[in-house]
Amino acid sequence: SLVGSEMCIRDSIKAEIPAKAAILLGQHIGAPAKPIVAKGDVVKVGTKIAEPGGFVSAAIHSSVSGKVAKIDTIVDASGYAKPAIFIDVEGDEWEESIDRSETLVKECSLTSEEIVKKIADAGIVGLGGACFPTQVKLCPPPAFKAECVIINAVECEPYLTADHQLMLEHAEEIMVGVSILMKAVKVNKAFIGIENNKPDAIQLMTKVASSYAGIEVVPLKVQYPQGGEKQLIDAVISRQVAAGALPISTGAVVQNVGTAFAVYQAVQKNKPLFERVITVTGKSLAKPSNFLARIGTPMKQLIEACGGLPEDTGKIIGCLL
């Protein structure tokens, strides 16, 4: 089977904070962010270190506390040299504005415009892989009207279980995030699409959704590439995106389930996007795991936390398909 999810541990582990972090300025689709710190500046966890570089761009925040070592290029996973902010880590001091408690905050009194601004300030981007700046997606062109929000919790990519794990651990927070997204685009209906190979997530999310107005969990047959935006819209609301048209032309605003959780954290907890759950897996690893990892953590560190690579490892790759 290509699914491979049986290899992953059913809990997410907090990855160790790196000794040095390299935070890319172009983590998202669109213009790279512009640095607002310089060598020698002291930063905390959650400090804004770069502003959006254009309309389609995203703010970047420090995932660590310490001192800016340099702003230089680093070779990214695609093999290209990209600008990044390098930080020497000292301690783990967070910005005081971030609510670090685990208390669930359900009520949101902000207006749609205030929600979108808070999401933009927090640097939230789509966490399904494309990293499209979320605030842009929540402000469609005037010619289009949103009718519903669709949450992509399909995770059809073989071996990945990060979204699955997130739903099992943070179903309530995700549901509040979905409600906030609904308010942001002024709709009263949301659908959460989950494939049938995650029955525990479907059961839990359905139970939690029952106490939130207008949110419906939609079980879907297991089919690749159902996690694609256009395919998901068709599967959930039976509307096709015409060739060359935007997905919003169907009335749907699609967001990843990880993005919904990040929106909850940004709007309700004042927490910018500086960490995410990531799956590190494969038959070469002694202990495949899901990690809650700070952005800028070297992949080598996560691989070593899984037991390291044997000498006969063929390749280290991203998604299979």
Tell me what each language-model feature is:
Residues 2-9:
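Short, small-residue-biased leader/transition segments that mark boundaries at the very start
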Residues 38-51, 70:
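Short, well-structured beta-strand-loop connectors
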Residues 66-68:
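Conserved hydrophobic positions within beta-strands
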Residues 75-132, 143, 199, 212, ...:
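Acidic low-complexity segments
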Residues 95-97, 149-163, 284:
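Gly-rich Lys/Arg/Thr-decorated short loops/hinges at beta-loop-alpha junctions or inter-strand turns
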Residues 188-299, 305-312, 320:
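Hydrophobic alpha-helical positions that pack around
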